[in-house]
Amino acid sequence: MERILVPIDGSKCARHAMEKAKAIAKAFGSTVVLLHVNDFYQHVTLYKMTEVEEMFMEQFDQLSKDILAEGKAFFAELGDRVETVQLEGNVANRIIEYVNSNSFDLVVIGSRGKTGSMDFLVGGVAHKVALHAETSVMLVR
């Protein structure tokens, strides 16, 4: 188990996923890649952004960086075996694209994120990733 992807969004379930991934990484000497997808970009017009949209975009970008920094701090004991990636767009689609275009042995993802989704048992993003990722996926509550 060389590489583990952990999509994070700052939610409680994402924290639980990080805890599981950390235990696995420590046991196998794995590299952990923390991924945060900023979905604000899919809600703004590409033609011309207003000042308010630009301000929100900057705030969401900083929030993404903060989430990744907190995640990296959580995995500090792994040293250089922790990487962070920030992407923009539809959360589920970008996670799936990233997983399927890179070499991962496992995806560890929280069963529900911050979207407030009321999907039965499993959130929409986690469900879509589990169905479409071309590697093993562990859903964590």
Label each residue range with its predicted role.
Residues A73-V107:
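Structural beta-alpha unit
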Residues E2-E51, A76, E83:
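Small/aliphatic-rich secondary-structure junction motif
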Residues L106-L131:
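Glycine-rich, Arg-bearing micro-motifs that act as flexible, cationic patches
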Residues V137-R141:
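Short hydrophobic/aromatic patches at helix-to-coil boundaries
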